[in-house]
Amino acid sequence: DGFTIVPGVLGDPLLSELQSWSQDVFERVPVDPRYRYQGSDIHVYTPDRWQLMDREATHQHFSDPIVQKLLDQPEQKQACIDLGLEDVRSAGGGLILLSKPAFGPPLYWHQDFMNWNHPEAAAPWPTKIFLSYYMSDTTRENGCLRVIPGTHRRRIDLHDVLPNAHTPEIQAIDDLDHPIFADHPDSIDVPLNSGDLIIADARLLHAAWPNQTDQRRTLVLAWHDVFSFPQPPSWWEGEVPDV
């Protein structure tokens, strides 16, 4: 399907620490209106990674030791091992805070994968994944995740009308009746509890419902590379396709 859920991976004290920390961030950091559909786009890095970047901190980019705590979390690493994910490594040494404010709009359908002109785009196994946690329980009412299973490997009609996910064009769309917000017949809701780990292939079409509550709904997302393309997973038994 292109995604999986591992319940209850993130627990206290780290879950409570992340909840308090992320709430504090949004109390002091202004959110760029360009990211109204995501809710925010705040990148936070490990201190070691930040030192290598040699840049000035801004509201959108800064470092915090809590990032390393999450990346090193033993239960998360074990979940990846149990799923057969090999050579999992942080893509950039950071995480992204995506927080839909009270009564925030929906997030459009999109794929986050960017290396479409490379053979890895056709690989039958993932090469880039996100590992994410919601800081509160999610439902359709407060903007839970939506996915279209199988679209990491299968083209559908929606692909023909989607602008590039990483350009101003899609951010500039104001019509909430546009197909990028549609309730696609193959889509499913993915409600989660706080602390549940959701892992998804970057090629998977996904979106989120609007937040119709008066409470913020925050997601902590960390991109990871997985497997070492072009080498297949060690457990791969089928013929390796010529991609």
Question: Which sequence ranges carry the predicted segments?
Answer:
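Double-stranded beta-helix
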Residues: 125, 138-204
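Short edge-strand/loop segments of extracellular domains
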Residues: 98-101, 148-156, 223-229
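Histidine-centered active-site/metal-ligand motif
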Residues: 59-61, 110, 152, 206, ...
